[in-house]
């Protein structure tokens, strides 16, 4: 409100500057000095930070998206633990009793029925884990409903793109924040670590895959690109991928190229709040 420009200073830049000192020291005052020096030297590369309605909504989406990830990770850990317990109780029979051993129907069955000769300790442990699994299922569903509501309120429609479901769309919107921070698809690609970094010397021109950038955003674009070349993906992406392979690139390199194209599409959709149009050529 006072007319000041606020920028986001990644801690890694301050840390790198401190490590380059002859005698690296750390304190709050030195950190503040390091932040000021980074701003003076790299102001043209730092992203602006603005509190807009779009940024606030994106932050809410990010928090819900991360909450969902934590719950899904917990559910995965419980599944692995239950595998061991169910195998000890039913041997290999538990795998053929249900198509999905961890469906709601299966979980309720494991909780209600146990082998007569089973150890009481194992039964109690199994029931605790099954109860938590059922609770997690309900909590994840509630979070997904909230995410759907927030995505609808945001006005963004990137979930209409093939290979971009609810979870990927929520991750992208949450990590990008206000799309107006990024003046071009290239700046978004660099932020996400989807832009190649130059490693040239003399007449030799080389480009390598970037391992920096926002890793959650990078992973979301990677999963989106993988979906594009799956059997259920779209033909244009598959044709582009095959063309890159025919040009001499490895499949992993071709996938990196496709991921960069996904950034272009997502930037355009976020910038103009348009739905995905597979027939567009730009």
Residue positions per predicted region:
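Short, charge-rich amphipathic alpha-helices with coiled-coil/heptad character
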Residues: 41-61, 112-115
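Short alpha-helix plus adjacent loop in nuclease-associated cores
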Residues: 7-50, 204-212, 229
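Phosphate-backbone recognition surface of nucleic-acid-processing proteins
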Residues: 159-160, 166-251
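Glycine-rich, often acidic, oxyanion-interacting loops/wings at catalytic, nucleic-acid
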Residues: 59, 64-157
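Glycine/alanine-rich phosphate-binding loops at beta-alpha junctions
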Residues: 1-6
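Acidic, carboxylate-rich catalytic segments that either coordinate divalent cations
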Residues: 232-282
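Short helix-capping/linker segments at secondary-structure and domain boundaries
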Residues: 42-47, 78-79, 137-141, 177-181, ...
């Amino acid at each position: 409100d006072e007319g000041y420009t606020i920028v986001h200073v990644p801690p890694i830049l301050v840390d790198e500057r401190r490590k380059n000192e002859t005698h690296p020291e750390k304190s709050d005052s030195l950190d503040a000095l390091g932040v000021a020096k980074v701003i003076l030297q790299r102001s043209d590369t730092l992203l602006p930070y603005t509190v807009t309605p779009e940024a606030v909504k994106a932050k809410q989406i990010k928090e819900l998206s991360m909450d969902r990830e934590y719950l899904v990770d917990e559910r995965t850990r419980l599944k692995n633990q239950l595998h061991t317990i169910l195998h000890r109780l039913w041997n290999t029979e538990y795998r053929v009793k249900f198509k999905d051993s961890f469906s709601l129907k299966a979980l309720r069955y494991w909780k209600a029925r146990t082998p007569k000769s089973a150890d009481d300790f194992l039964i109690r442990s199994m029931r605790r884990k099954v109860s938590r699994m059922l609770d997690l299922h309900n909590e994840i569903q509630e979070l997904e409903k909230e995410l759907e509501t927030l995505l609808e309120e945001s006005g963004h429609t990137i979930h209409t793109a093939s290979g971009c479901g609810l979870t990927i769309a929520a991750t992208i919107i949450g990590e990008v924040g206000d799309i107006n921070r990024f003046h071009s698809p290239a700046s978004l690609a660099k932020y996400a670590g989807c832009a190649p970094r130059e490693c040239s010397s003399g007449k030799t021109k080389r480009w390598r895959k970037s391992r920096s950038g926002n890793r959650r955003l990078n992973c979301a674009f990677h999963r989106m690109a993988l979906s594009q070349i799956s059997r259920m993906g779209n033909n244009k992406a598959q044709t582009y991928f095959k063309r890159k392979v025919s040009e001499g690139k490895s499949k992993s390199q071709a996938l990196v190229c496709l991921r960069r194209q996904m950034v272009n599409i997502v930037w355009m959709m976020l910038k103009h709040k348009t739905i995905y149009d597979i027939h567009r050529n730009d």
